[in-house]
Amino acid sequence: MTEPTQTQPAVAADENQIIAERRDKLRALREQGVAYPNDFRPTHHAAELQSTYADSDKAALEANPVEVSVAGRMMLKRVMGKASFATVQDGSGQIQFFVTPNDVGAETYDAFKKWDLGDIVAARGVLFRTNKGELSVQCKELRLLAKALRPLPDKFHGLADQEMRYRQRYVDLIVTPETRDTFRARTKTISSIRRFMENADFMEVETPMLHPIPGGAAAKPFITHHNALDMQMFLRIAPELYLKRLIVGGFERVFEINRNFRNEGVSPRHNPEFTMMEFYAAYTDYRWLMDFTEQLIRQAAIDALGTATIQYQGRELDLAKPFHRLTITQAIQKYAPQYTDGQLSDDAFLRTELKRLGVDVSQPAFLNAGIGALQLALFEETAESQLWEPTYIIDYPVEVSPLARASDTVPGITERFELFMTGREIANGFSELNDPEDQAARFKKQVEQKDAGDEEAMFFDADYIRALEHGMPPTGGCGIGIDRLVMLLTDSPTIRDVLLFPHLRRED
């Protein structure tokens, strides 16, 4: 049999006309009986067949017939006189159907010729290879399972509008193999993290999404109202304080993979709703956390991609090498060597320099900022975006780390790190502050900052203080941004590419 050159259906100028024509076809189907049947069960998937019979030639398949039942979406159709082909796509991949009136009957064949691209179809038949060597299903029975009323995008142009890809992700997934690959990699990444945590004796838990007091991070919360309790509540900005309550309760290793919500801007790195993995381990510190996090991320890459060496936006990123470790001032002087030690400890200089770089130092967060907070702001302006290779920035100042344990040896510094790759923060962790009186004092300072106009400053959580007063063992805790990690592993330039349904403005 010969396979003619593929011809594409003409692109209709009026999509509404296409939809109207398809609705007419659906009405005809309804008149014939059940328009959306649900009694077909596939026995095989496309990728499974392509893999299992990759080495089976035409003669082998003829000598040992393989009966299959396959269903999926019709992506291409080539109708000829007495023999036609259709490319059908299921959740695993694609396979070709070969359809003739002799095999399926003249009535079914005539109906098939009227079916549209995008329709969900099913076939029972036997495998064979065409003269060109393509593995195909010779259909003995052919059925229409679901009529597609809307046409798929043109094959050659696809979903050219990027926002439309986000808004109609269901269509994007149908027509863009790379999108499907991205979300499969995301699932593999999360599965790998879960296995890694369970193998390290961590227990997965679930903590509340609705909080009476927002806490665990410096962020602006979403506010809602609980009608039955008649009280204001907040979508959680972080699970940290609840997870540490569990450490107090005796669960010495816990983790949670779930959503956080922050009522802030949208950018290539930020979405108001995002996925975090936070974990806490008793009798550890931030040094242990850095080693553990490094191993976890390396293993996630291997499990998702098969390698620890990845390509991101045209540059290589080697996760197999030991991650770098720098203090805030070391990072500044590495990537902006014009700054001297004296300048980095000069309050007036730092404020002037930040203003020159475009930072509004008059905002509430800077009014009473100390040297450490000013150094951090300068780091964010001069060094952060240049941290391509995996790098831990360590020793954050107390004033910007209200939940972290202070250093025993260096005044004003905490045992805290943030992990950066490709210029983005991926993780944040520290030895946890378990002194209830110190924690209460820091909460009070946060309240003062909030009263001064800093919307992201923390509230005073009296119940959390009460939990600490029961005694929390020395603990290390870390949060990893799952979305940003998946961005790296899938070479995605924006967080929207790794969220199935990112937040968008309303359609007009």
UniProtKB/Swiss-Prot annotation:
Keywords: Aminoacyl-tRNA synthetase, ATP-binding, Cytoplasm, Ligase, Magnesium, Metal-binding, Nucleotide-binding, Protein biosynthesis. Its cofactor is Mg(2+). Gene3D superfamilies: Bira Bifunctional Protein, Domain 2, Nucleic acid-binding proteins. One of its GO terms (cellular component) is cytosol. Its EC number is 6.1.1.6. HAMAP family: Lys_tRNA_synth_class2. This is Lysine--tRNA ligase. It comes from Burkholderia vietnamiensis (strain G4 / LMG 22486) (Burkholderia cepacia (strain R1808)). The lineage of its organism: Bacteria, Pseudomonadati, Pseudomonadota, Betaproteobacteria, Burkholderiales. The gene is lysS.
